């Protein structure tokens, strides 16, 4: 199954486009299971991740997912990781990052971070970059089972053949919990609107447009399932669309709220039968997660239609046997 995500920003003329190969890695769940740590992790970590990440998408007073009502919707937030390479500083220091349309910040681990997660990943050495500018401000970002804290700075960011100057980013100095310990990526590069940012300053793609680095104000994702023939496993194209990777016309949708990439979804059906959202509802497109989330009553309706039952801990071992949504 191939999926193509196209996101349009605003009218712009630039000078280039760049391809970033993406790699798909085993989920955190799979890695913890292989190491025999999954059950302990699920027992010890019960974050209300949905409320933290998506609550602002819903009107005030809308019931959202409650803790323990659907644990898979909480713990599956990193079950599909597609990451690519960037570099920071001069001389360049390389990092693997998740290109995430569900957040707007760029951060990587700092050389001063003392958390276990940082010790297992590449860390930015600000003192080795002759183009680094220390900001002095601090930031905090919540991610499911924990959070990270850090300090802000500015430096040169290179993605493919594109170099963006004076990019604001974060150096994490504290990454508690197991969320990032088994992750194959080092940090996150957010592609959402600036209003979603925890770190002050423009997101990376906004700066690319401001510095006239891209031909078009468009970035597109190609994400493939892992198969013997899926080469590449994925690709991010900054500044354009690869027409060889899809067939038929593109269905362009207007952004209904600038923060997340929020759009109007017409309906949700299970095997052709409408389950909820019959007159349309708001949804967000998020490359940083694989969960389906929404108001409690709608999610309960969806779970009933596919034969799912709530559980506090455990694994979904028979997903392929469930009805298609």
Per-range role (PLM):
Residues 61-184, 325:
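Signature of the N-terminal lobe/flap region of pepsin-like aspartyl proteases
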């Amino acid at each position: 199954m191939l999926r193509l995500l196209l996101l349009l920003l605003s009218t712009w003329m630039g000078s280039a486009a760049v391809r970033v190969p993406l790699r798909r890695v085993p989920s955190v769940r799979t890695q913890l299971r292989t190491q025999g740590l999954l059950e302990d992790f699920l027992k010890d970590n019960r974050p209300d991740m949905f409320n933290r990440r998506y609550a602002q998408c819903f009107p005030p007073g809308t019931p959202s997912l409650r803790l323990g009502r659907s644990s898979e919707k909480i713990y599956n937030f990193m079950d599909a990781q597609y990451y690519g390479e960037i570099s920071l500083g001069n001389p360049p220091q390389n990092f693997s990052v998740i290109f995430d349309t569900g957040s707007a910040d760029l951060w990587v681990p700092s050389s001063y971070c003392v958390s276990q997660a940082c010790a297992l990943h590449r860390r930015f050495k600000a003192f080795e970059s002759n183009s680094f500018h220390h900001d002095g401000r601090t930031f905090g970002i919540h991610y499911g089972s924990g959070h990270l804290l850090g300090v802000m700075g500015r430096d040169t960011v290179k993605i493919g053949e594109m170099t963006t100057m004076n990019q604001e980013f974060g150096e994490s100095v504290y990454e508690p919990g197991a969320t990032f310990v088994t992750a194959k990526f080092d940090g996150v590069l957010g592609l959402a609107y600036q209003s979603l940012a925890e770190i002050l300053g423009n997101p990376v793609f906004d700066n690319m447009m401001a510095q006239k680095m891209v031909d078009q104000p468009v970035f597109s994702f190609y994400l493939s399932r892992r198969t013997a023939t899926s080469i590449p496993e994925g690709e991010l194209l900054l500044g354009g669309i690869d027409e060889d990777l899809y067939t038929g016309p593109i269905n362009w949708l207007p952004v209904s709220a600038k923060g997340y990439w929020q759009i109007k979804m017409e309906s949700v059906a299970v095997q052709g039968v409408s389950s909820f959202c019959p007159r349309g509802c708001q949804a967000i497109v998020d490359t940083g997660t694989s969960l389906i989330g929404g108001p409690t009553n709608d999610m309960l309706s969806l779970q009933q239609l596919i034969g799912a039952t709530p559980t506090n801990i455990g694994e979904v071992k028979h997903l392929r046997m469930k009805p298609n949504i």
